[in-house]
């Protein structure tokens, strides 16, 4: 079949000019729209986002976010994504995975209107966080990019209204996305991109059936992004289900230089955990913002109420609080309003880790899948500029340990991780402070040491417990005052406070956003009668030698001033008269008789 010649401006075929076979082959390849461009190898490191040839409006949004240069995962993934390749990426926390898929999706959305992108995440908190980042990056795009978040619990009427105008980007959990696809509210016929963020968590939280149903409904040719911190068997099976010949990026080695976490271990008794955390914060041994990880929510409030006795303020990230309150706590923590955040990873104990140690005590899982998945905080949520991660209760698995310490030393910064370990012979020796999850601390510690990366190791924290002996009598009274009843009252009090703020003041804060800064989440939850004000101050005699110099108060005389002397002599010997003018018999009684001495 003869090839058609190119027409000129007068619709007349131009004579075919002789050209090289290579040029002719390239022209033939351009005339076939079905064949994708040949993938070019991505650069190891890209100096700036401008080199990625992104839409100019997105580059302005990137500058507003003060993103410097692309991270390793962004340098590798974005050029491949712009070529239309499916991406299966393994990269640690804090390495810029969110930007690696958001930027190419936003770029393609601006070029091709009428297409939809679906982003699946394991939790509502992560969905809101991604929504915020996507809106910030597309701030200069006006109405060209419409973003909707349907991960939260809301009525079907509200969700249908959000999806009625076919938004460009939809963010949801797999359960919510599957439900809305079944009802027809979420149309996937024009789906261009599908993202599964934190793939290992999505599979661990039991969304396999929802993902299978979504995979059956999406059309062919959808570009896939699968992001995960680990590539286990479940994630690889998910990749084979959704992806078509994906590019596998394993970028842990490229990000090792940015992980500068100094890891320390302190082996102590159960009650000594409270003594150590009191001394560390009160004596200023921990600098900067700190996340304290504990076993469960009750444990969070026990630590908070204990620290309140000494005037140490902290806030609890409680899964029972309203979603808006939890996100506000994270935002305020990132703004350096709070320095100590107490969090729990209840999903670890609820069994989200499939290969967790069977000897661990198991709690009954909640019936509501969404409620269960909202409680974990060691993954997904971004905490900025965290200096220290304190494992008050050691995690249940070695994977959870690495996820926890991944909250610090992000974006090339250094950080510290300190872990309290309960030896076997000291477990259950102090019933009021014991925690069932600490029974196998030493076994989990061995697994952590076994899976350490090259150049990383756990060191013993050199802490002389004898120097803390003077503090024991102070911390003992404070610890005894934190009873189960006090913890229950504190939890109820905080939930009532946060519900009141969320319901009654939501409209007010929409109209007056500056007043939101006055909300504090580190309020005192202790009953006033339980707080002893003198415990807030550490006397000099309790401090180790040389920690604080005695104050110079000058010369203190022992003589009574003359004025006071005269007043004392003048008033001496006077009869004490009652208010009614009568003589006090107790002061004037004389056993020998009147007038006799």
Swiss-Prot record:
Compositionally biased intervals (Basic and acidic residues): 1-13
* SMART domains with a match to the protein in the record: DEXDc, HELICc
Tell me the ranges covered by the Helicase ATP-binding domain, including all copies: 78-249
Sorted keywords for this record are: ATP-binding, Helicase, Hydrolase, Nucleotide-binding, Nucleus, Ribosome biogenesis, RNA-binding, rRNA processing
Per the entry's comment, what about the domains?
A: The Q motif is unique to and characteristic of the DEAD box family of RNA helicases and controls ATP binding and hydrolysis.
Task: Write out the similarity annotation.
Answer: Belongs to the DEAD box helicase family. DDX56/DBP9 subfamily.
The protein in question is named: ATP-dependent RNA helicase DBP9
Species of provenance? Phaeosphaeria nodorum (strain SN15 / ATCC MYA-4574 / FGSC 10173) (Glume blotch fungus)
Q: Which gene encodes it?
A: DBP9
């Amino acid at each position: 079949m003869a090839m058609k010649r190119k027409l000129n401006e007068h619709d007349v075929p131009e004579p075919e000019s002789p050209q090289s076979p290579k040029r002719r082959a390239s022209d033939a390849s351009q005339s076939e729209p079905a064949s994708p461009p040949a993938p070019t190898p991505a650069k190891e490191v890209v100096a700036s986002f401008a080199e990625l040839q992104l839409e100019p409006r997105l580059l302005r949004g990137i500058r507003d976010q003060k993103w410097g240069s692309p991270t390793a995962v962004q340098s590798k993934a974005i050029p491949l994504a712009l070529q239309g390749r499916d991406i299966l990426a393994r990269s640690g926390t804090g390495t810029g995975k969110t930007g690696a898929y958001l930027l190419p999706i936003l770029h393609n959305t601006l070029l091709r209107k009428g297409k939809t992108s679906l982003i699946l995440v394991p939790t509502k908190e992560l969905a809101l966080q991604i929504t915020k980042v996507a809106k910030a990056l597309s701030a200069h795009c006006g109405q060209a990019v419409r973003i909707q978040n349907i991960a939260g619990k809301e009525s079907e009427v509200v969700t249908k209204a959000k999806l009625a105008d076919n938004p460009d980007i939809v963010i949801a959990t797999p359960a919510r996305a599957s439900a809305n696809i079944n009802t027809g509210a979420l149309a996937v016929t024009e789906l261009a991109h599908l993202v599964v963020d934190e793939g290992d968590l999505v599979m661990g939280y039991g969304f396999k059936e929802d993902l299978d149903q979504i995979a059956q409904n999406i059309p062919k040719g959808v570009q896939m992004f699968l992001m995960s911190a680990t590539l286990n068997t479940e994630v690889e099976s998910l990749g084979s289900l959704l992806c078509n010949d994906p590019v596998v990026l394993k970028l842990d080695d490229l990000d090792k230089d940015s992980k500068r976490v100094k890891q320390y271990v302190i082996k102590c008794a159960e009650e000594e955990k409270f003594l150590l955390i009191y001394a560390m914060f009160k004596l200023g041994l921990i600098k900067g913002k700190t996340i304290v990880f504990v076993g469960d929510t009750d444990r969070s409030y026990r630590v908070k109420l204990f620290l309140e006795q000494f005037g140490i303020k902290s806030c609890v990230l409680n899964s029972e609080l309203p979603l808006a309150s939890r996100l506000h706590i994270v935002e305020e923590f990132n703004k350096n309003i709070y320095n100590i955040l107490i969090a729990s990873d209840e999903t670890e104990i609820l069994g989200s880790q499939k290969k967790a140690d069977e000897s661990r005590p198991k709690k009954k899982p909640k019936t509501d899948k969404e409620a269960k998945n909202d409680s974990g905080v060691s993954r997904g949520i971004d905490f900025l500029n965290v200096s220290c991660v304190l494992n008050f209760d050691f995690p249940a698995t070695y994977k959870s340990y690495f996820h926890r310490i991944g909250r610090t030393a992000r974006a090339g910064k250094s950080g510290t991780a300190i872990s309290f370990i309960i030896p076997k012979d000291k477990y259950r020796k102090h019933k009021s402070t014991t925690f069932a999850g600490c029974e196998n601390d030493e076994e989990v510690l061995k697994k952590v040491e076994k899976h350490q990366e090259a150049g990383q190791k756990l060191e013993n924290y050199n802490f002389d417990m004898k120097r803390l002996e003077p503090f024991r009598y102070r911390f003992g009274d404070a610890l005894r005052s934190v009873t189960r009843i006090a913890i229950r009252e504190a939890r109820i009090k905080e939930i009532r406070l946060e519900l009141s703020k969320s319901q009654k003041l939501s409209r007010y804060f929409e109209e007056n956003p500056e007043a939101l800064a006055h909300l504090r989440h580190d309020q005192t939850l202790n009953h006033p009668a339980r707080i002893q004000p003198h415990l807030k101050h550490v006397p000099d005699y309790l401090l180790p030698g040389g920690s604080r110099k005695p104050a110079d108060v000058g010369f203190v005389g022992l003589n009574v001033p003359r004025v006071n002397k005269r007043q004392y002599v003048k008033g001496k010997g006077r009869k004490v008269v009652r208010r009614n003018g009568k003589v006090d018999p107790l002061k004037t009684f004389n056993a020998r008789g009147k007038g006799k001495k």
